[in-house]
Every structure is written in structure tokens, then in C-alpha cells.
């Protein structure tokens, strides 16, 4: 069927938008590095282009280009243009203020690293070779080995910590009942303890343990109801009333997930005694049936990310149910989404 001229025009416009989709995120990274969100916030009111330009640490010869940078940032919805050349923050860019508790700057900078982009650019080569991941094709080693030997690992920890701050701010106020009545909780793969610290603060009588690889928790200071323990979740998990895994299992293949879940099963008491596993994970939705388009896009993007960087994936409810059953659990309950992820209680 021959395309009409209007269809060709629309297709071409859409084509160029998609081909250059990286430009908006690269521009946002530039804005963060230049301190544009903080400059506008510190101004205390919508900020004129001239004032913004004068406040930034740029070479004077580059001043005329700030207008063009702001134009794409406004078009992408990152900033709002109150009137011509007068800018203000949006809820999105408030997440990029250095002193904000929900600061997610490390996430913007982390996903735009050369190491990450190199992996994405190796995807077509990966489809034609025997490597397990495109990341391995790009770097000659898997993600975990690369992260353990390179500063990239610290950047990854920063990205996960930023995500944990966002999750904890929504998880504890809205889903605090998940932790009520517990005497002890182990946060498996809890990194530097961002979520566990928030839980321990909200539930001072709850003994919280952060369990992660020894090099991750080394030199981290324990408190009265929070301690850090090093180890390997594939070998043994410390005992507790409940085990928390936030966005951990999506990094692993089904067989490895079952192994970790079996370790969790051994570490908790029976359901009658309050034993449970709490997951924060994506439950893939049918994009044609769900009205939350942004959440669906985030889930699909996360799934392809798992393909490129890990031998893993995001999962549907049916796929989760299969893993729980194979690991020896009797049931589960999926709660409403926090963002594009949901709390899941799994019962022995």
C-alpha cells in the first residue's frame, strides 16, 4: 500500500525524533553537570535566560548556546517555560536538586556513562555471537566482574542508592504495614543500607540487617537496630522474620532466582509464625490493557536493560508464581505499584 504524503511527513518526523531520542537525555546530563536545576531553584522564582546564563560556570563564548540547550530541555518536559525565555522547575527536575532528599542525580549521570553506552552499542554484535550479554561483548567480562574491578561499581552503587531513596520515600509511608509486627528483617543486596536505615528509623524495635557482598558493606557503621553483614546470598542468608529483596531478582536468571528464594525460605519461620519474603519488583503488565502508559514504558525499558547488562529479565505475574512455587513457597500477594514496581509478599 502506497503511503500518502501526510503519512510520509508524519513518519519522517517520528523517525527523526526516535533517531535523535538520545539528545534529550544527553542534554539533561549536561544541565545537571552545569548545575541548571540548582541555579533555577536558588533563584527563588522563574528565572530569565540572561540571569540563568550569567549564573552558570561556562565559557563566555558559549553563552549564546544556553538558549538552545534550554529549548530541548523544555520540549522534553524537563523544565517549564513560564513565558518566553523564563524557566522554572518541574516535578521531574526537582529530583535533580543536589540538596533534595530525593536527589537522583547519580542515576542521570550513571546511565549515561561510556561503559553503559558501549554495551548498548554492542547489542547487534551480541545477537550474532555466543556471549551471554551485550555488556560482555563490549567489555570482555560480565557486569559483576567489571563492577568489582572498576570505579564503575561505585557508580552503580550510587545509582542503586538513589533509587532506594525514592523507593523508601514511597514504600514506608504507603506500605508500612508490610513491616508492622516484625522482630527482625534482613535486606538482601541492600547496598549501603539506604532502605534499611529508613525502615530502622520508622520501626525502632525492629532489628534490621543489611546483607551484601563483603566489599560492599566493609567499613559501614552499624547502629543500635541496624547492622551490616557480608556474605553471598547464593550460599546462605541470615535468619529473620522477613527477608527484603529490592530489585534484586530481576538481575538473575530463573534458576538463580529459585536458588536465592530457597535460601530465603530456609532463613524465615513458617507463615503461621510471621515468616515472609518481601520483594520490590516489576510485574510486567499488558501494555494494551493498562492505562498507566508511563509505567508500562518503564517496565519494558527495564526489561531490555536486563537483557543488555545481565542474563536476566522482568517477569509477568505468571512467571513470578512459577518461581515461587519451584522455591517451595505456598502463596503470594502483589500490592499496588510504587512507581512501575510493586511490593510482593511471598509466604512459606
UniProtKB/Swiss-Prot annotation:
Q: List the PROSITE patterns.
A: SAM_OMT_II
Q: Which Pfam families match?
A: Dimerisation, Methyltransf_2
Query: What InterPro entries does the record tag this protein with?
Result: COMT-like, O_MeTrfase_dom, Plant_O-MeTrfase_dimerisation, SAM-dependent_MTases_sf, WH-like_DNA-bd_sf, WH_DNA-bd_sf
Which SUPFAM superfamilies does this UniProt record tie to the protein? S-adenosyl-L-methionine-dependent methyltransferases, Winged helix' DNA-binding domain
Is Membrane found in the keyword set? no
Q: Which domain of life is it from?
A: Eukaryota
| UniProt-annotated binding residues for S-adenosyl-L-methionine | 189, 212, 232-233, 246
- CDD domains cross-referenced by the UniProt entry: AdoMet_MTases
Q: Which UniProt keywords apply?
A: Acetylation, Methyltransferase, S-adenosyl-L-methionine, Transferase
Q: Name one GO molecular function term.
A: myricetin 3'-O-methyltransferase activity
Record's comment on post-translational modification: The N-terminus is blocked.
Q: Which reaction is catalysed here?
A: S-adenosyl-L-methionine + a 3'-hydroxyflavonoid = S-adenosyl-L-homocysteine + a 3'-methoxyflavonoid; S-adenosyl-L-methionine + a 5'-hydroxy-3'-methoxyflavonoid = S-adenosyl-L-homocysteine + a 3',5'-dimethoxyflavonoid
Its Enzyme Commission number?
Answer: 2.1.1.267
Q: Where is the active site?
A: 250
Enumerate the Gene Ontology biological process terms.
methylation
Modification type N-acetylmethionine: residues = 1
User: What function does this protein fulfil?
Assistant: Methylates myricetin and dihydromyricetin at 2 sites. Inactive towards 16-hydroxytabersonine, the phenylpropanoids 5-hydroxyferulate, caffeate and their CoA-esters, flavones and flavanones possessing 2 or 3 B-ring hydroxyl groups.
Record-stated family: Belongs to the class I-like SAM-binding methyltransferase superfamily. Cation-independent O-methyltransferase family. COMT subfamily.
* Name under which the protein is recorded: Myricetin O-methyltransferase
Instruction: Give the source species.
Output: Catharanthus roseus
Upper lineage is: Eukaryota, Viridiplantae, Streptophyta, Embryophyta, Tracheophyta
Amino acid at each position: 500500500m502506497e503511503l500518502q504524503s501526510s503519512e510520509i511527513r508524519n513518519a519522517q518526523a517520528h523517525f527523526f525524533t526516535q533517531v535523535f531520542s538520545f539528545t534529550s537525555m544527553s542534554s539533561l546530563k549536561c544541565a545537571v553537570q552545569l548545575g541548571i536545576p540548582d541555579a533555577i531553584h536558588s533563584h527563588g522564582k522563574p528565572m530569565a535566560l540572561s540571569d540563568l546564563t550569567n549564573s552558570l560556570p561556562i565559557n563566555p563564548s558559549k553563552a549564546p548556546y544556553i538558549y538552545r540547550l534550554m529549548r530541548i530541555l523544555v520540549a522534553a518536559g524537563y523544565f517549564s517555560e513560564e513565558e518566553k525565555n523564563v524557566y522554572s522547575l518541574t516535578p521531574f527536575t526537582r529530583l535533580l536538586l543536589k540538596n533534595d532528599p530525593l536527589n537522583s542525580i547519580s542515576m542521570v549521570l550513571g546511565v549515561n556513562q561510556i561503559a553503559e553506552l558501549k554495551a548498548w552499542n554492542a547489542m547487534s554484535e551480541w545477537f550474532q555471537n555466543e556471549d551471554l550479554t551485550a555488556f560482555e561483548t563490549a567489555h570482555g567480562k560480565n557486569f559483576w566482574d567489571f563492577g568489582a574491578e572498576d570505579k564503575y561499581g561505585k557508580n552503580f552503587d550510587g545509582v542503586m542508592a538513589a533509587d532506594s531513596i525514592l523507593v523508601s520515600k514511597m514504600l514506608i509511608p504507603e506500605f508500612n504495614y508490610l513491616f508492622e509486627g516484625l522482630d527482625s528483617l534482613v535486606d538482601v543486596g541492600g547496598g549501603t543500607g539506604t532502605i534499611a536505615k529508613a525502615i530502622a528509623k520508622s520501626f525502632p524495635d525492629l532489628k534490621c540487617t543489611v546483607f551484601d557482598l563483603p566489599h560492599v558493606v566493609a567499613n559501614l557503621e552499624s547502629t543500635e537496630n541496624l547492622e551490616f553483614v557480608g556474605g553471598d546470598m547464593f550460599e546462605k542468608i541470615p535468619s529473620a522474620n522477613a527477608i527484603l529483596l529490592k530489585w534484586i531478582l530481576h538481575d538473575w536468571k530463573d534458576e538463580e532466582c529459585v536458588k536465592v528464594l530457597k535460601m530465603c525460605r530456609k532463613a524465615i519461620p513458617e507463615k503461621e509464625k510471621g515468616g515472609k519474603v518481601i520483594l520490590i519488583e516489576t510485574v510486567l503488565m499488558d501494555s494494551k490493557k493498562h492505562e498507566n502508559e508511563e509505567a508500562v514504558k518503564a517496565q519494558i525499558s527495564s526489561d531490555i536493560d536486563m537483557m543488555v547488562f545481565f542474563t536476566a529479565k522482568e517477569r509477568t505475574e505468571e512467571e513470578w508464581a512459577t518461581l515461587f512455587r519451584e522455591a517451595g513457597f505456598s502463596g503470594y500477594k502483589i500490592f499496588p505499584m510504587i512507581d512501575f514496581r510493586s511490593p510482593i509478599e511471598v509466604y512459606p
